[in-house]
Amino acid sequence: MTQAFNERIVQALKQRREQGLNRQSEVIFSGNQTVLEHQGKRYLNFSANDYLGLANDQSLVRAWQQGLSLYGCGSGASPLVTGYTPAHSNLAASLCDWLGYESATLFGSGFSANQALLFALLEKGDLLVQDKLNHASLIEAGLLSPASMKRFKHNDLQALDAILNRSDCPSLVVTEGVFSMDGDCSPLAEMHALTQRYSASLMVDDAHGVGVLGEEGRGSCALASVKPDFLVVTFGKAFGLSGAALLTDKSSGDFLAQFARHHVYSTALPPAQAFALTHAVEMIRTQQWRRDKLNELQTLFAEYLGEHDSFVATQTPIKPWLIGETQQAVMVAQRCREQGIWLTAIRPPTVPQNTARLRITLSANHTKEQMHTLAQVLLTVTGEH
């Protein structure tokens, strides 16, 4: 490595450590369950995105095993070569039937799906309008795309209206259905009405809404009776697996098959995974009890902790516990860990300055007893018990 690059790396890491923002992966056993193990100790896990409790569901495990017996391991090629199997086709058809679209383009991650559309669709002279709290994949793609990008204050419809009112070029408005760090929902009905008024297109990343909200878990868009032009759903949260799909009309799907580089030049999802995902879709659609259980746990969370200054009310399983100062958030997370609760301190740049927090996430597999323990520990470590 050249000296210039080495110095750049060393300096960046030093600065990150000095700011108290250094992050690292820890080896976790059973991180997809409500009780995880780390270095021989067990902790209640309130940090995973396994909202419906599918990630370790034995029915889904068996579906993956059946997929392996039918299709083997990897897909062996990109979707446009030999990597698109009946398992992929069936998954796409299931998603379209469930969510009401004509086309579902599959990707290895939500990050790829988000960036694929923006890079393929936008040209110089277009306007990209994004919520300021959109996911890093969306913001990065916007910064690198040839389009002009404007960002509006979080969920501020007046600000969005003003931006669209001043534009006469092709415009794409992008938001999240549920925001991953705040757990709040986008005002999709009003936003959709604005895009209709100004002849703009709407893209919604519903990674944290699909499976959890709406009839049959169709997500935040269905809950708001809105059908965006482009809908991204990801498989690493409520589905209990990984990957993503971009749902569109047929013409847009054909366009993505030709021009979405993340799709064209990536090896297709393992067919066994696609097979299991089709089973997950069926579980999500038919097992309403999982969403009912989540709603019960959310009610308990509010009953136990709703009076605390750090409590933030949400209608989703994402429950931010606002602290503010970065080192204080790290300290509270560590004290919770000492009491057997695994929570993660979320710090800048993931969230804005002075909004460091614990990101608490609920799963349908959590018990009422575990919720009570969580509340007791949070109150104890914050000195209010």
From Swiss-Prot:
Record-level Gene Ontology MF annotations: 8-amino-7-oxononanoate synthase activity; pyridoxal phosphate binding
Cofactor(s) of this protein: pyridoxal 5'-phosphate
PROSITE patterns tied to this protein: AA_TRANSFER_CLASS_2 (PS00599)
Any one Gene Ontology BP term: biotin biosynthetic process
Keywords, ordered alphabetically: Biotin biosynthesis, Pyridoxal phosphate, Transferase
Residues given in the record as pyridoxal 5'-phosphate binding sites: 110-111, 180, 208, 234
Binding site for substrate: 23, 135, 350
Pfam annotation, one family: Aminotran_1_2
Family classification: Belongs to the class-II pyridoxal-phosphate-dependent aminotransferase family. BioF subfamily.
Complexes and interactors: Homodimer.
Listed name of the protein: 8-amino-7-oxononanoate synthase
Source lineage: Bacteria, Pseudomonadati, Pseudomonadota, Gammaproteobacteria, Vibrionales
The encoding gene: bioF
